[in-house]
Regions:
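Short, well-ordered coil/turn segments that N-cap beta-strands
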Residues: 20-26, 43, 67-70, 120-122, ...
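Phosphate/pyrophosphate-binding betaalpha-module
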Residues: 163-172, 198, 202-217
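Short secondary-structure boundary/capping elements
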Residues: 6, 31-34, 76, 108, ...
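Enzymes and membrane/adaptor proteins characterized by extended Gly/Ser/Thr/Asp/Glu-rich
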Residues: 36-155, 174, 179-193, 221-231
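Preference for extracellular/luminal or secreted protein segments
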Residues: 1-42, 49
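A generic secondary-structure signal
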Residues: 17, 61, 115, 162, ...
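Divalent metal-coordination and catalytic microenvironments
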Residues: 19, 75, 116, 203, ...
Length: 231
């Protein structure tokens, strides 16, 4: 292995006290169609798009039955309206970039966080920090802020700050970087074709800056990165 992650003593002690089912409940995020018993044992719960009232009721019900505090998550990449019927839906991250106003992207994140937290969510799967390197990419398109890494970083970072400043955990996606392939990573393992230097100077730079600036979560995509294999 190229990198070794050091063990945290407190985490290790907690893990050693868990059986397999308890451990899986800490690292797997079930969705709301799972049985109520299974959901209430988990530490995370993904809720599919629904109305404001239905989502709020489900979150309150699961919370009341759970043995511990849970984190509720859904995909609000374009604002809370992406998942919550009746909440504000914003245009794409590309639109935020084309508007040329970093503060607008920040306010998008702020509004998304405010509406999501009112329902009971703690976490969202966004923003998308992919670079549009191939205009025929079926996954990226206008979800990407730009073809330019600096614009991608500028506007998605503003959106992330808006989310996290107002209490909603942000998620960067899709590591190690989509946008250079013509394949849908949900259907096949797509390949990021960049050389090590190209990746370091683009996606590597973007993710490094986000980590330094306090992003909480990074989502891995179904994407290979041959430049960083074991060779």
């Amino acid at each position: 292995m190229k990198y070794i992650i050091k063990e945290n003593k407190m985490v290790l002690e907690k893990v050693n006290k868990m059986n397999l089912e308890e451990l899986l409940n800490c690292i797997v995020c079930p969705n709301i169609v799972a049985t109520q018993e299974d959901v209430t044992k988990a530490y995370f719960c993904f809720i599919h798009p629904n109305t404001y009232d239905n989502m709020k009721r489900k979150i309150e019900n699961i919370t009341s039955l759970n043995q511990h505090k849970m984190l509720f998550v859904t995909d609000m990449e374009a604002g809370a309206g992406s998942a919550i019927d009746g909440a504000t839906r914003f245009p794409s991250m590309r639109a935020a970039c084309e508007a040329g106003d970093e503060n607008l992207a920040y306010l998008m994140g702020k509004a998304a966080a405010y509406e999501a937290r009112k329902v009971g969510f703690h976490w969202t799967f966004g923003p998308c920090v992919d670079i549009l390197g191939n205009h025929f990419s079926p996954m990226t398109s206008i979800r990407s802020a730009s073809e330019n890494k600096d614009d991608v970083l500028k506007y998605t970072a503003a959106y992330m700050r808006g989310l996290q400043d107002f209490g909603l955990i942000a998620t960067l996606k899709h590591f190690p970087g989509d946008g250079y392939t013509m394949f849908d990573q949900h259907l096949t393992t797509s390949c990021n074709p960049l050389t090590k230097k190209q990746w370091d100077d683009s996606y590597g730079y973007i993710y490094q800056q986000f980590i330094h600036n306090g992003v909480k979560v990074i989502m891995a995509g179904h994407i290979s990165l041959p430049a960083y294999d074991e060779k």
